[in-house]
Design a protein with these regions (language model features):
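Domain-level signal for soluble alpha/beta catalytic cores
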Residues: 3-141
Length: 141
């Protein structure tokens, strides 16, 4: 823990940290639950956490009610392990679900679960367009 805190101590401005369970290629290679990580997450000196949920599922959102209120969340709403491009409606429903569980004040960002490095560029571009369309649909734009 100390090394992580030390690594973040020199950063000015907003500090974000991405965490996922490493399901490379869609295969879950690490087991665990977000609730088990709450003591660790509550000790981190970060402004917001960037988390995967689209692939993993949203069943554990309740665990984040135990997160320090000043730590905001980035919620993954686009599955980067699948070539299928989500519809705007699917993404809007994922956002709505997260907001219903955690409240709008906790969610700072919606984003893909992780990076798109495994996907063809054309798929990644369409997924990003779907993310924008889903966010806009959720916001009623």
């Amino acid at each position: 823990m100390y090394k992580r805190q030390h690594a973040l101590s020199g950063i000015r401005g907003e500090k974000s940290l991405h965490l996922c369970f490493g399901n490379y290629g869609g295969q879950s290679i690490q087991k665990g639950y977000w609730k088990d990580l709450m003591p660790f997450l509550n000790k981190l000196d970060v402004d917001h956490l960037v988390l995967e949920f689209a692939r993993r599922g949203y069943d554990e959102l309740d665990a984040f009610k135990e997160l320090r209120p000043e730590t905001k969340l980035g919620v993954g709403v686009v599955d980067i392990k699948d070539n299928e491009v989500e519809s705007a409606d699917v993404i809007a429903k994922r956002i709505e679900n997260a907001v219903n569980v955690l409240g709008m004040e906790r969610i700072k960002w919606v984003h893909p679960d992780c990076g798109f490095w495994m996907l063809p560029r054309s798929v990644a571009d369409r997924k990003m367009a779907a993310l924008v369309a889903g966010r806009d649909a959720y916001l009623g734009r």
